[in-house]
Amino acid sequence: MSGADLALLGVGALTDLLHRREVSSEEVVRACLARIESLNPKLAAFITVSTEAALRAARRADGELARGRSRGPLHGVPFAVKDALWTKGVRTTNGSRLFEDFVPSEDATVVARLRAAGAVLLGKLNMMELGFGPTLRPPFGVPRNPWDLERTTGGSSSGSASAVAARLVPLTLGADTGGSIRLPAALCGVVGLKPTRGRVSHHGLMGICPPFDSAGPLAASASDCALALAAIAGRDRKDPITTRVAVDDYAGAIGKGLGGVRIGVVRELMQSAMLRPEVRALVADAVTALEKGGARVEEVSIPLIDHASAIYIAIAEPEAAARFRPYLLTRPHDIDVLPRRRLLTASLIPASVIPRARRLGQRLRAQVDEALRAVDVLVSPTTPSPASPIATAGRIESKEEAWTTAAAGRSLFTNPFNITGHPALSVPCGFTAERLPAGLQVIGRYYREADVLRVAAAYESITPWRDRRPEV
């Protein structure tokens, strides 16, 4: 197999080749590095590429395999991470000039766990500034969608999705506060998973709102995400939010099919006036495929979900404004105008609003829990629309554009599950007439990521979307 072909393989395929010693980790890493060198100037997916460190780590991985020591299925597999996650000795910018010289002295827990599993870090990925975009002039280049270089990637884990879609790297980590893993996954045509709150450590994540933040994997398939989640999930003494709930056998859930699975279609999200008709049609087709595949499908109602964005804004945005207040006071012009305005606006939200928003969030959580008592998973569109042209991103000229182009509108269907803390995943479910990807969102019960991954993998197996790649 040629080096160019190696870069196109997913985690599972690479695992088999590496453990059979048919290829070396160094060969795989060199193939990915060559593809990054060729395509990153077009995509701006990577901020930092750690070439020499990656090659050294690959050689160590090869040496261990040669001695009969395997650290698991990720041993020797390349990965990259959103630049909001600490990486020891590698600068971590959080997508901002504010942190362009910050070099952490330790890894984020999720990064450390992937390294401990034998995975090889290639570098750091581009993102919306501070995770709080959109940004008119991103300091490290405009991330571009591999399916159409004039379209947005979504965010804020922009490079995490585009790098997987373009096959620069088979596995990435992102972070999700209101949809920042699932949104770019949907718009770039890959799989992205936000785990249950407390399933994965926050330690070393430069987040926005700790109650809503979560790190998680992005990859070309649900099975690849399952392998990554197994490595990063679990209790962490450095993060009191993490729980002692046992980590499931995620890989074991893959391949179980849809027989006996009960799926609830969220009525309010499917009937949303903000949902573009072509995306609604693709999601409806996905639901039909799930039913034909053996699932039992019914409609469920979550009345308060229509107000989730207001709840989200009232809680998350003041939290972000407080977090970045010192920089707003001392270095405001080192923050792009759009996130700066958004942070300043958020600082004006009265403190009295926040307790009420939290109470409404608890009611929303109860309604989602109630819906999940009757079914195993919920499904909905991931985004209301496909990727928008970069030229119009951030310009708001109508009420519809305010919801479907601005950050709040993009997260209209994803932020409810940051508020409630349920696990949620986006899996590709087809393409629009303009050949732009759309995503199906799958939501599960607390700590039941295995159910979400099972349904996503089963859907992939009965549809052709998993094997589609953009021509970059």
Label every PLM stretch briefly.
Residues 25-29, 59-62, 252, 275-301, ...:
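Acyltransferase
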Residues 38, 116, 165-273, 284-293, ...:
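Structural helix-boundary/capping segments
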Residues 52-62, 118-119:
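Long amphipathic alpha-helix in the N-terminal Rossmann-like dinucleotide-binding domain
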Residues 1-55, 292-294, 468-472:
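An N-terminal boundary/leader segment
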Residues 91, 416-419:
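Conserved short alpha-helical elements in the N-terminal third of ANL/AMP-binding
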Residues 74-215, 266-269, 382-402:
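Short glycine/serine-rich loop/turn segments
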Residues 2, 74-94, 252-267, 315-369, ...:
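Short helix-loop capping/hinge segments that flank enzyme active sites or metal/cofactor-binding pockets
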Residues 32, 54, 76, 82, ...:
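Conserved hydrophobic/aromatic pocket- or pore-lining residues that grip, position, or stack substrates
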